[in-house]
């Protein structure tokens, strides 16, 4: 008897039995997979969620670092700008007594004396030249009278009664003040008018 002719106890050929069993397995598998969730799919979904969260944290971290770098760059630029603007402050403070001395020399000089006129003219030119040079570097003189007292640029020394100047205004300058690029480096010492 050949293998094709061999029959199983039920009367089926072996190939038919294998095919029938395979169809039964295929029919059972879809039902089983519909009822059970593959644990690998859950793990994949969990890992994808963790990855998305990690990417979001990374993006936020990068944005924070970029913002910090930009702020640091701006602060550094401002610091450098201030350093350039106010680098001369110490030097200007050393020059102020010299400028004050030239001012006092002009105040006490006998301008009516013809013998002194050359010296007075020399002092005036020296003072003018020095003030022109410091102005080029942002220094301004505070020496206006009849302006309201400003505590940022004036230091009141005395109150004096006056009919000519409004109360609270600067009546006279005892010592000139100076600013460097808008910042007061020495307040002007002034007398202030008060009502009679």
Curated annotation (Swiss-Prot):
It comes from the Bacteria. This is Protein GrpE. Homodimer. Pfam families: GrpE. The keyword Cytoplasm applies. SUPFAM superfamilies: Coiled-coil domain of nucleotide exchange factor GrpE, Head domain of nucleotide exchange factor GrpE. GO terms for cellular component: cytosol. Keywords: Chaperone, Cytoplasm, Stress response. Participates actively in the response to hyperosmotic and heat shock by preventing the aggregation of stress-denatured proteins, in association with DnaK and GrpE. It is the nucleotide exchange factor for DnaK and may function as a thermosensor. Unfolded proteins bind initially to DnaJ; upon interaction with the DnaJ-bound protein, DnaK hydrolyzes its bound ATP, resulting in the formation of a stable complex. GrpE releases ADP from DnaK; ATP binding to DnaK triggers the release of the substrate protein, thus completing the reaction cycle. It is found in: Cytoplasm. The keyword Cytoplasm applies. NCBIfam families: PRK10325.1, PRK14140.1, PRK14150.1. GO terms for biological process: protein folding. It comes from Escherichia coli O139:H28 (strain E24377A / ETEC). Residues 1-39 are annotated as: Disordered. Its main location: cytoplasm. InterPro entries: GrpE, GrpE_coiled_coil, GrpE_head. One of its GO terms (molecular function) is unfolded protein binding. Belongs to the GrpE family.
């Amino acid at each position: 008897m050949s293998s094709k002719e061999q029959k199983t106890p039920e009367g089926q050929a072996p190939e038919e039995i294998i095919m029938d069993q395979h169809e039964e397995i295929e029919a059972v598998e879809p039902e089983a997979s519909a009822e059970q969730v593959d644990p690998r799919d859950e793990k994949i979904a969990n890992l994808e969620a963790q990855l998305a969260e990690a990417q979001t944290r990374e993006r936020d971290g990068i944005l924070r670092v970029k913002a910090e770098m930009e702020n640091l760059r701006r602060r550094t630029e401002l610091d450098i700008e201030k350093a350039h603007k106010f680098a001369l402050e110490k030097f200007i403070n050393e020059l102020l007594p010299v400028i004050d001395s030239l001012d006092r020399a002009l105040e006490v000089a006998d301008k009516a004396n013809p013998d002194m006129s050359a010296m007075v003219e020399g002092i005036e030119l020296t003072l003018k030249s020095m003030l022109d040079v410091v102005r080029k570097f942002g220094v301004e003189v505070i020496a206006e009278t009849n302006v309201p007292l400003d505590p940022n640029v004036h230091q009141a020394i005395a109150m004096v009664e006056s009919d000519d100047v409004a109360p609270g205004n600067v009546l006279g300058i005892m010592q000139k003040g100076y600013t460097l690029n808008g910042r007061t480096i020495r307040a002007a010492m002034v007398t202030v008018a008060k009502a009679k």
